[in-house]
Each structure stands twice: as structure tokens, then as C-alpha cells.
From Swiss-Prot:
This is Olfactory receptor 1P1. The lineage of its organism: Eukaryota, Metazoa, Chordata, Craniata, Vertebrata. It is found in: Cell membrane. It comes from Homo sapiens. The gene is OR1P1. PANTHER family: OLFACTORY RECEPTOR. Its main location: membrane.
């Protein structure tokens, strides 16, 4: 059954932009329209959420308690793990509550709040890999000046700038969504995101929609291009390295980051920059893509970054054994 009419039924109450009341509620489509699958999804997503939070928290604690990892690369990794925890916690707990209570509702104010925080933390998951790529570029292409360029002050500035910029961008896009008129209470997704809200908009505010599309494209493509340029230069520098051992060591510091970037940006570009229809199959594909970048990628990040990194694995083992290193050692 297509969703064009059944899934987006027009509501008798046109929701004019900026005039929505605090009593209005959206109905989320959820993870599946099959009731018999809800219990399976609840257990699966609960497991993934617990592992995601525990894994990323372990990364943060391991880096924070081991002075051997107090370097720019691990500072950015700890920041990314924090963003992953916050981003996942913005969407998954509400989805789990809705499954458990068999309720699909979310208040209008709650929807806007979820949208704002998801955009803020989600954009951090886009901006931080760009700073990490820049860090790897400096480490490999300008090794002699690395500590001078990537000073503690500059690292703190880059992360602070990312948080500030993502907050402002999220606030702008949330405000533009607030101004749109909505003609359906049913959102095609399991959380409040730009795509589902744009699909139920019936306003002709083309300027708002164009600004939203422009900002969304800029947030995704500019960091992606910076990452691409950084790694083109990194690969070029590595290939010019005189020794095979040096090339392998340089590649080993970048390959895990490339896996995360490819997985995350592939699904984000599919979700935000490739238009989709309101058909049943399209909604399911959009939901699957959303699961990938909101749940699966944050789940995999700790494993991808730690499995290929001996220092990270050693720090995690020391943390689990209670042997932390707060002082400069060895």
C-alpha cells in the first residue's frame, strides 16, 4: 500500500507556521509498521544503545585517564565520542519509550527540541571528522611543525568553534521549520528530523525551504570536501615516503578514520541530499538510512577506532584493570 494518501492524510487543522499550540502532537511512523516486529526492534535498539553509550564512554575515560593519549588526535576522538553519545541519546531513548508504551506521539515542542539537539550533535559528527582529517594532514605532511600547529589552544579553539557553529546552524534550521505550515500530523520516521518535517509541510514558503536545503548541503558537503582534499594530500605524501614501513605506519593512523567517514557520509548524503518520494518503500529506505547514521555508526566508532590502534587498546585495557595513568610516565 502506498503512503501518498494513507500515510500523509491531510489534517482538518492546518498548522500555520509559528501558530502551533503546546497541545499539538505528531505521530511518528516508527521503525516498522509491523506490530509483530516491535518487540524485536526494542531489544535490538536497547542493546545497540547500551553498547554505544558504554563503548564511547569507555573511549572518553580511557583517553582522559591516560596521559600517553593526551594528544590532538585523541582529543578530537574523545570529542567525537561525546558527540556520538549525545546524538544517539537524543533519538533512541524516545524511540524505545514509544515502542514499549505502544505510543507513537511526540509533542510539537518536544519535536522541535529533539530536532534542535539532533542537528547540533549530528552536525558535530560531521564537523569533527573534518578536524580529525586536518590533524592527520598536519601530522603526516608537516610533521616537524605538528606540535606548534596543533597546539592545545588551537585544538580547543577548533572544537569550540565546531560546537558554536553547529548550535547556530541547528537553531537557524529549527526556526525555519517552526515557520513552515504543516498539513499532516504523521511524520515518516522514528524521530523528528528535517526530511520528515519537510515532507509534511504544505506551505509555499520556498525561501525557507531553499535556505534549509542550502544549509543542509553546506553542512554536509563542505566538511566532506575538506576531508577529501586532506586525504588526497595525505595519500600523496605517503606514497612519496621512502620506506615501506613508514608508509604502512602512516596508513594505519588513517584507515580507521576513512572507514568511519565512508560509512557515515554515505548514509547522510543518501538521506539529506538525494530526494525521495512519499511511497512506502521510500519511507522504509529513509528510515534504514537514518538508523545507519544515528545508531549504527556511533555503535561502530569505538570498535573501529580501538581495534586498529594499539595505544587505544592498551589504554582501554589499563582502564578496565584499574591501572590509570594520570601523571606523565615512562
Amino acid at each position: 500500500m502506498g503512503l501518498t494518501q494513507d500515510f500523509f492524510p491531510p489534517t482538518s487543522e492546518l498548522l500555520e507556521g509559528g501558530n502551533q499550540t503546546s497541545t499539538f502532537e505528531f505521530l511518528l511512523w516508527g521503525l516498522s509498521d509491523q506490530p509483530q516486529q516491535q518487540h524485536i526492534f526494542f531489544l535490538l535498539f536497547l542493546w545497540m544503545y547500551v553498547v554505544t553509550v558504554a563503548g564511547n564512554l569507555l573511549i572518553v575515560l580511557a583517553i582522559g585517564t591516560d596521559t600517553h593519549l593526551h594528544t590532538p588526535m585523541y582529543f578530537f576522538l574523545a570529542s567525537l565520542s561525546c558527540a556520538d553519545i549525545f546524538s544517539t541519546s537524543t533519538t533512541v531513548p524516545k524511540a524505545l519509550v514509544n515502542i514499549q508504551t505502544q505510543s507513537r506521539s511526540i509533542s510539537y515542542a518536544g519535536c522541535l527540541a529533539q530536532l534542535y539537539f539532533f542537528l547540533t550533535f549530528g552536525d558535530m559528527d560531521i564537523f569533527l571528522p573534518a578536524t580529525m582529517a586536518y590533524d592527520r594532514y598536519v601530522a603526516i605532511c608537516h610533521l616537524l611543525h605538528y606540535m606548534m600547529i596543533m597546539s592545545l589552544h588551537r585544538c580547543a579553539f577548533l572544537v569550540t568553534a565546531c560546537w558554536t557553529l553547529t548550535s547556530l546552524l541547528a537553531m537557524t534550521r529549527t526556526f525555519l521549520i517552526f515557520r513552515l505550515s504543516l498539513c499532516s500530523k504523521i511524520l515518516p520516521g522514528f524521530f523528528c528530523d528535517l526530511g520528515p518535517l519537510m515532507k509534511v509541510s504544505c506551505s509555499d514558503a520556498q525561501v525557507n525551504e531553499l535556505v534549509l536545503l542550502f544549509l543542509g548541503g553546506a553542512v554536509i558537503l563542505i566538511p566532506f570536501m575538506l576531508i577529501l582534499v586532506s586525504y588526497i594530500r595525505i595519500v600523496s605524501a605517503i606514497l612519496r615516503a621512502p620506506s615501506a614501513q613508514g608508509r604502512r605506519k602512516a596508513f594505519s593512523t588513517c584507515d580507521s578514520h576513512l572507514v568511519v567517514v565512508a560509512l557515515f557520509f554515505g548514509t547522510v548524503i543518501r538521506a539529506y541530499l538525494c530526494p525521495s518520494s512519499s511511497s512506502s518503500n521510500s519511507v522504509k529506505e529513509d528510515t534504514a538510512a537514518a538508523v545507519m547514521y544515528t545508531v549504527v555508526t556511533p555503535l561502530l566508532n569505538p570498535f573501529i577506532y580501538s581495534m586498529r590502534n594499539k595505544d587505544m587498546k592498551a589504554a582501554v585495557v589499563r582502564l578496565l584493570k584499574g591501572r590509570v595513568s594520570f601523571s606523565q610516565g615512562q
